Amino acid sequence: MKNWKTLLLGIAMIANTSFAAPQVVDKVAAVVNNGVVLESDVDGLMQSVKLNAAQARQQLPDDATLRHQIMERLIMDQIILQMGQKMGVKISDEQLDQAIANIAKQNNMTLDQMRSRLAYDGLNYNTYRNQIRKEMIISEVRNNEVRRRITILPQEVESLAQQVGNQNDASTELNLSHILIPLPENPTSDQVNEAESQARAIVDQARNGADFGKLAIAHSADQQALNGGQMGWGRIQELPGIFAQALSTAKKGDIVGPIRSGVGFHILKVNDLRGESKNISVTEVHARHILLKPSPIMTDEQARVKLEQIAADIKSGKTTFAAAAKEFSQDPGSANQGGDLGWATPDIFDPAFRDALTRLNKGQMSAPVHSSFGWHLIELLDTRNVDKTDAAQKDRAYRMLMNRKFSEEAASWMQEQRASAYVKILSN
């Protein structure tokens, strides 16, 4: 399932990977600051976009329009990659391997199957890796730069959290596609009128049955244009505010817009809608433990045996769990409280500790458990279900505000970077 992010690591990445091609003399397609976009980059992306469109049975615009979109995408990528190089942004091999493994998993493939699929489609695996690395650098630079421009006030979180709470039962997620008809900075009235006329003409075409994906590829200046403008699933509150109101009564299949923003005119298509329950209840546990840490004077095995003896003494009534914790436990945070860890959700604990704890019944004590901290005796004192809806709503409100503001800021930021860069297109 896709989220409403500007860039995603998914199978669509394959569409950004250059094809292996016969060795010919390469040419410069565009100069971007102190870098270049090569004809092979344009041709490779052109071929792979066509391949993906064919696999998705999606119509494409004419080659000249598609080439323009691809050129703009590669120019923007080059600008951001140059920024990343200046900032020293690097993606390790481990991060890259994990990202590729996630892509394979999202598409229900093993890595070997993914390699085979790439080869079948004529894609070189090393070239694919390099492209994914570039996409990760681009994403990190953009995310870091845009987030620095965003401020979220506590009052905003409180206000949106209340709205989310009031709308819990009627909450809806939307699957959207998007077309952006751009405006330059400080546009003239003629430029605004021309862009609005173009947007209205596209709305008319879409409402009369034209393929929205093809229209997006042909006309949209949004980063998702080459994916047919697909934004995927998300909550209405995660969208820019100017979109949310326009979509409040939208139905499946509706074409909404044009909507004016600071960067241009937006057109939205509602591909689908679905509801979702917002009530959130979690199970908390009240536990206590005794921790022994292996050291130069206590081996791992000695720590385990010592805990077995302590457990036997507790069971026989020779001592209590609390007294033993105060005497023996090496956890400075809980020893003086008789090992009491208070109420918490199990997922905050070390995995081995958590797994052992969740297997216990109320009042039951575990056998010695080994974790990354050492050896534990664990006793489950009680469990309870807690309504976390309010806290979850505030957390969700913060993330919605971040997504909303990020979407608005990212478009402005990218427009600024494009306007301030030296770009000379040498081929058409």
Curated annotation (Swiss-Prot):
InterPro entries in the cross-refs: OMP_Chaperone_SurA, PPIase_dom_sf, PPIase_PpiC, PPIase_PpiC_CS, PPIase_SurA, SurA_N, Trigger_fact/SurA_dom_sf
Cited Pfam families: Rotamase (PF00639), Rotamase_3 (PF13616), SurA_N (PF09312)
A GO term, aspect molecular function: unfolded protein binding
One GO BP annotation of this record: maintenance of stationary phase
Disulfide feature: none
PROSITE patterns: PPIC_PPIASE_1 (PS01096), PPIC_PPIASE_2 (PS50198)
Signal peptide range: 1-20
Protein known as: Chaperone SurA
Organism, scientific name: Escherichia coli (strain K12)
